[in-house]
Amino acid sequence: MDWTWRFLFVVAAATGVQSQVQLVQSGAEVKKPGSSVKVSCKASGGTFSSYAISWVRQAPGQGLEWMGGIIPIFGTANYAQKFQGRVTITADESTSTAYMELSSLRSEDTAVYYCAR
């Protein structure tokens, strides 16, 4: 596979402490520059609507970087300035699933993406 024009997006499962909530994310993705990626995060074992779901990422050799978050019951997301206009975070209360979509992908977006509560 030619990796020159493709970037790897890896997502990882995270387990919340409160109420033994488990967050399960969608799998790894390979995307072309300029395209977008949408990652899902399904919660189980606790109340979904009332607690904030945050999205963070970790690029190779770097620390964690907060991208944004949402409280499902309110429906309005907050974003880090760096990602304004490129990231969209949503939540579907009916399926207890949060989503993070990142558009206009660049090589610098190669990272492990996590949802957390």
Curated annotation (Swiss-Prot):
Region (Complementarity-determining-2): 70-77
Record domain Ig-like: where: 20-117
Chain positions covered by the region annotation Framework-1: 20-44
SMART domains, per the entry: IGv
Gene Ontology biological-process annotations: immunoglobulin mediated immune response
Annotated stretches, region: Complementarity-determining-1: 45-52
Classification via PROSITE patterns: IG_LIKE
Disulfide bonds: C41-C115
Region of interest (Framework-2), ranges: 53-69
Record has Glycoprotein as a keyword: no
Record region (Complementarity-determining-3): 116-117
Region (Framework-3): 78-115
Compartments (UniProt record): Secreted; Cell membrane
Modified residues (Pyrrolidone carboxylic acid): Q20
Signal sequence coordinates: 1-19
GO CC annotations on file: extracellular region; immunoglobulin complex; plasma membrane
An annotated Gene Ontology molecular function: antigen binding
UniProt keyword list: Adaptive immunity, Cell membrane, Disulfide bond, Immunity, Immunoglobulin, Immunoglobulin domain, Membrane, Pyrrolidone carboxylic acid, Secreted, Signal
Role description: V region of the variable domain of immunoglobulin heavy chains that participates in the antigen recognition. Immunoglobulins, also known as antibodies, are membrane-bound or secreted glycoproteins produced by B lymphocytes. In the recognition phase of humoral immunity, the membrane-bound immunoglobulins serve as receptors which, upon binding of a specific antigen, trigger the clonal expansion and differentiation of B lymphocytes into immunoglobulins-secreting plasma cells.
Subunit architecture: Immunoglobulins are composed of two identical heavy chains and two identical light chains; disulfide-linked.
Name under which the protein is recorded: Immunoglobulin heavy variable 1-69D
The organism of origin for this protein: Homo sapiens (Human)
